[in-house]
Amino acid sequence: TQTARKGSDVTAGYGSTGTAGADSTLIAGYGSTQTSGSDSSLTAGYGSTQTARKGSDVTAGYGSTGTAGADSTLIAGYGSTQTSGSDSSLTAGYGSTQTARKGSDITAGYGSTGTAGADSTLIAGYGSTQTSGSDSSLTAGYGSTQTAREGSD
C-alpha cells in the first residue's frame, strides 16, 4: 500500500506500506513501513520502519527503526533504532540505539547506545554507551561508557 504525493518517486517491495511527500524519493524493501516528507530522500531495507521529515536524507538497513528530523541526514545499520533532530547528521552501525539532537553530529559503531545534545559532536566505538551535552565534543573507544556535560570536550 503506497501513496505518492505530487512529484514524488516511489519504488516499494511487496507487503510494504508507505507515503511519499511532495517531490520526495522513496525506496522501500518488502514488509517495510515508510513515510517521507516533502523534498526528502528515503531508502530503507526490508522490515524497517522509517520516517523522513521534510528535506531529510535517510538510508537505513533492514529491520531498523528510525525518525529523521527536518533537513537531517540519517544512515543506520540493520536492526538499529535511530532518531535524528533537525539539521543533524547521524551515522550508526547495526544494532545500535542513537539519538541526535538538533544540530548534532553522531558517528557510532555497532551495538552502541548514545545521545548527542544539541550542536554537539559524538564519535563512539562499538559496544559503547555515550551521552554528550549540548555544545560538547565526545570521542570514545569501543566498550566505553562516557558522559560529556554541556560545553565539554
Please describe what each predicted stretch is.
Residues 1-153:
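Thr-biased low-complexity repeat/linker tracts and other Thr-enriched repetitive architectures
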